[in-house]
């Protein structure tokens, strides 16, 4: 099963609360922090919601 490496590349300062909550739910707390998440519909939906703040790479295992 594929996984996604998600990196927070834009600051959370001045962002709406719903975007802050989404990034925290993805496990991202600091800029340039990278987390590995499973590639499923729920994660893809969260990533699409804040895609302008993230960099996403697919990881094959």
Swiss-Prot record:
It comes from the Bacteria. GO terms for cellular component: cytosolic large ribosomal subunit. The keyword Ribonucleoprotein applies. One of its GO terms (molecular function) is structural constituent of ribosome. Keywords: Ribonucleoprotein, Ribosomal protein. The keyword Endoplasmic reticulum does not apply. GO terms for biological process: translation. Pfam families: Ribosomal_L30. Part of the 50S ribosomal subunit. NCBIfam families: rpmD_bact (TIGR01308). HAMAP family: Ribosomal_uL30_B. Belongs to the universal ribosomal protein uL30 family. This is Large ribosomal subunit protein uL30. It comes from Exiguobacterium sibiricum (strain DSM 17290 / CCUG 55495 / CIP 109462 / JCM 13490 / 255-15). The gene is rpmD.
């Amino acid at each position: 099963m594929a996984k996604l490496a998600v990196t927070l590349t834009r600051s959370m300062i001045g962002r709406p609360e719903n975007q802050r909550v989404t990034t925290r739910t993805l496990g991202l707390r600091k800029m340039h922090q990278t987390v590995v998440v499973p590639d499923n519909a729920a994660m893809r939906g969260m990533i699409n919601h804040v895609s302008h703040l993230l960099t996403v790479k697919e990881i094959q295992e």
